[in-house]
Every structure is written in structure tokens, then in C-alpha cells.
Amino acid sequence: MGDLPGSTGGGSGPAAAGNASGNSSSAGNTGLGVAGTTGVDRPPSPARLSHTSEKHPKVTLTELNMLRRHRELCDVVLNVGGRKIFAHRVILSACSSYFCAMFTGELEESRQTEVTIRDIDENAMELLIDFCYTAHIIVEESNVQTLLPAACLLQLVEIQDICCEFLKRQLDPTNCLGIRAFADTHSCRELLRIADKFTQHNFQEVMESEEFLLLPVGQLVDIICSDELNVRSEEQVFNAVMSWLKYNVAERRQHLAQVLQHVRLPLLSPKFLVGTVGSDLLVRSDEACRDLVDEAKNYLLLPQERPLMQGPRTRPRKPTRRGEVLFAVGGWCSGDAIASVERFDPQTNDWKMVAPMSKRRCGVGVAVLNDLLYAVGGHDGQSYLNSIERYDPQTNQWSCDVAPTTSCRTSVGVAVLDGFLYAVGGQDGVQCLNHVERYDPKENKWSKVAPMTTRRLGVAVAVLGGFLYAIGGSDGQCPLNTVERYDPRQNKWVAVSPMSTRRKHLGCAVFNNYIYAVGGRDDCMELSSAERYNPLTNTWSPIVAMTSRRSGVGLAVVNGQLYAVGGFDGSAYLKTIEVYDPETNQWRLCGCMNYRRLGGGVGVMRAPQTENYMWCENSLKQHNNPPS
């Protein structure tokens, strides 16, 4: 900062006298002055220093909060539930339009020193009043469902926005419908829009959730009538509708025609329309449904008439989405465990190497949680592992900061249910395990849940309808065909119908509301056979066998198609993959991985928004050429 301007003072003789008498504004302007002239006369400029305190608002709020805590100068008490909350009207009115209207208008509460607030959670109110005094709040899973309604009532828009942002970040296929309903109830339009988009984008996973089966008919119609619904074919929409219907046939069959009119039956294949839709007993027993089927048949049989038959049911859906990609992780190749990881893109039918794990892992359990790929346990060729690595496809990096499981586990089953990562069975080098534990990513902590009724290594796991299924495996003596499922609400395992074939080291996945179990090994040999489980009838039924025998096979659904990856055929490790077509009940080969893999894990994720795979270009050279 420069010096303050000053003047040079007076002289002597006539000039000085003239200044004294003729320019009174400069009289006495000697030493430090605030205005003056030097040579050329200028209008005086008063000195100023403007200051705005950045600390003042925080300090003032802190002091006001201290007064509140000590109940000093408080002029209102809020009775909420069984709790009394002391406060200052002016602070509440400044922060909340609700309180401003209450205390500055003609309402009776404006004259009361104690005000009762109804229909609001007392803990949520305490947090919101704290926010008014501190500008700080923590929104978390345990309080968001009470905070958001309270913030809406008090018209605290900033807190509403924070709660909605928190819920957006929590969206996944198992909870998006509940969050959507919550947003609709509280008129959170942006959250409702995001939840709708998420539901449409992830419909193939959403339709397998328990929330979907519990939908009211109106919400189901809202979802399936969307042009943006992301499905591989209209068959998936029909299957989803029938699963919903059969969840409670007695109450829902009256709505079948109302719902079926939003399934675009003319877009079905003729075989599916006649063989599946037209032959369904519930459809055949409803006249309006039969009319819809006849309309679709006419559309398919009379192509020359189609221009005259256009309507909402003949309009193809227009989903916009990033495709899914499949990751093959670790495994056993040429006599040793491997750390390599590669990615398959069905749109290009290409396999690319990505960053390897830090440890070699065979018998590794793999699952995707919150858009991150977890590799759990396994065997590195010398030791049984309890360590875990986590892969981020956006950065193409593995991290090792995940808490280890409580037990070493190889040949372990891993799956995600209700936001938790479950590790099921396996072996620890001493015994076959029935232990089950689950990982909370928020706490970075594993905790044990109820053990299975049977010890299982080489077990396959799947999640369907809010249950965790443990399928087959070996008890340490012989392969199993038994199946049990875990209910997290009761923390209990219950047996369900067994498979028709004993299988250990099998692959399994949920596809079109069935659990598919393929390959594995029985008492004598590696298997190519496959079967699927219907949870509505609690029955297993066979499907066509794969083209190759595959033990230690990975099975996954990618972009609505079922892929079997790698394995061992009894004489050679495999790098081939094959895909299943449920309409034709056939498997076909569709390419090869870079590495042969037995006992590798597979996981499916959205394709990264950016191709951050600089490592890939030289990965094969750095790790030598993969075995042929």
C-alpha cells in the first residue's frame, strides 16, 4: 500500500499570505493530511479503508449457538415429540420460511413462547436446528429418511438438496424403486427424474430385485411404458411383467390386461409370441389379453398392413446407455496362479488386457459393488489368501486398502446383496468352510452372519428376489447338488430344491429371473450340462449343454446375454467363451480370451466413460506373451 497523500506546507511573504487568505481549504494542511494539492488543484479525497470480516458470520453463529446451548436470550421453545428445543425466533425465521411465516404473521404461535411441532422426527428437528446455528450437517443412511421430510416441512431448501444428492449417490438396482417412491412422496422432482432414469437404464437388474416384485400396479405401468427402457428385447419386459404378476397371482391377475397393454407384443419374435405369451394360462384366460395377442399376431403376419397398424405398442424402445463389459480376473494357467486381468467388450467382441492385480489369485471370488470390482481371497500358488483388492475401471488401478476377510478363503463364492459384499464358504487350507461374512464398504469392515447348514468349497452364489443362494460345491468329500438360500432379514439359511446334478466349481448367474447353473465337476468328470432354477416354483429344469465341458467356469450376464468363460475340460485349460440364446436354447462359441483360465473370477461393469488403458498397449510385452 502507498503512503497517504499530503501537502508541502506554506511558504513566506506574499505568496504564503495569499494562500492563507485566498485558499482556506489548504490552511493548516501541514504534516500528515488526508487531502491536499501538489502543484495542480484537485478536489479533496477523504481517506478510507473498507473491511468485510470473513470471520464475523462464523463467530457470530458460534456465539449465538453458545447462547442457545446455555439457554440464554432464547425466546421460543419447540416441543417436538418428547423433546424441548430452545432457540431464538430471529435465527429460525432467517433460516426457514416456515418459521418466518409462523413468527412474523398473525398466527397464534407468533405470541407463544412454547410451540408444538407435529409430524416431524425429533432427532431430525434437532439436526436441522443445529444446522441453522452452525451451517453444518451430516446426512447419512440412518437419518436421511427422516431429515428429508423434515427439511421439506421447514422449507430448508439447501438441506432438501443435500438429502437428494445423498440419495442419488446411493442409487443401485436393489433400491432405486424405493428411492423413486420416496422422492415422489416428498415432491423431489430432480431426484424423481434421476431415479426414473436409473431404473430405465438398469432395468435388466432392477427387474430381478425384490422391490420390483412389490411395486404397485401404477408404478409398474409407469416404468414399462417408457420408450427409454433399456432392454435387449421385448421378451425381457414380458418376463418381468409375468414375474411381478405371479408374485401375487390372486390379487394381481385382475391387472394383467392393464399391464400387458404396455408390453410391445408386436415387437416379440413369432416363436416367443405364440409359444410363450399365447400359451400362458393367465393370458389365455383373459379376453382383453387374448385381443392383445391377436393384435400382435396380425402385425407379424400381415407386413403389408403394418403402416396402418402403427401405435405405441409397435414403436421400438430407444434406450440410451453405455454398454457393459466383462472382466476375467486371475485364475490358474499353465500350472500356476496368475494375476492378469482382461476385459471383454461384446460390442467389439474384443478382449483387452487391463492392469493386473498385485497378487496372483486362483479360486478368487469376484463381484461388483458401487461400480468397483472386488477380488476376494484365492490362492497364490503357495498360500491361502484373505487379502482383497479393488479395481476402479475409470482409473485402471487396483487398490489394496480393503479390510481382509476374517478367514483365508479360496474357491469362495462372492456376491452383493443390499449394498453388502458377501463371502460364502470356500476352504482355508485346513478345512472346507461353512462360514459366511459380509463387508460394509462404508465401514471398511467384515462381520460374520449365520453360517450355511453345509460346508461348501467351489460353491456358486447368486442373488435373486432379496435372497442369497449358495449352490452346489463340495463338502470336502464329494460334490453337492444341494442348494440353500440366506434371508438377511432373518439372518437364516433355508434349504431349497436341489439341482439334478452334483456340481462343484460350477458357474452360476441370474438371467431373466432364473438362476442358471452350468458346468462344474461331479464325482467322475468335468461337465458341460446346464440347468436353471425357478424361484416361483422352487424347481430346477435342464437346458441344453454347453459346447465344451467346463469346470472352474465363470458365468455372467453382459448386456442381456449369458456368457460362459474359460474353465477346464478335463485335459486342457480353456480360453474360449460361449454365449447362450434362451430363445433357441443353444450355446455358440464367440471368441477367446488372451489367457487360458481355470478358477478365475468374472464381473460385469458399465464400460468406462474414458479409455484409461495406457497400460494395456504394452501389457502383453511386459508380462510376456500369454500361453497359447
Swiss-Prot record:
Entry-linked Pfam families: BACK (PF07707), BTB (PF00651), Kelch_1 (PF01344)
UniProt GO BP: negative regulation of synaptic assembly at neuromuscular junction; proteasome-mediated ubiquitin-dependent protein catabolic process; protein ubiquitination
GO terms, molecular function: actin binding; ubiquitin-like ligase-substrate adaptor activity
Domain (BACK): residue spans on this chain: 176-278
Region (Disordered): 1-56
GO cellular component, one term: Cul3-RING ubiquitin ligase complex
Pathway(s) this gene product operates in, as recorded in its UniProt entry: Protein modification; protein ubiquitination
Composition bias, Low complexity: 14-29
UniProtKB keywords: Actin-binding, Kelch repeat, Repeat, Ubl conjugation pathway
Residues annotated as domain BTB: 74-141
Kelch repeats: 325-371, 373-419, 420-466, 468-513, 515-560, 561-607
Role this protein plays: Probable substrate-specific adapter of an E3 ubiquitin-protein ligase complex which mediates the ubiquitination and subsequent proteasomal degradation of target proteins. May have a role in synapse differentiation and growth.
Record-given protein name: Kelch-like protein diablo
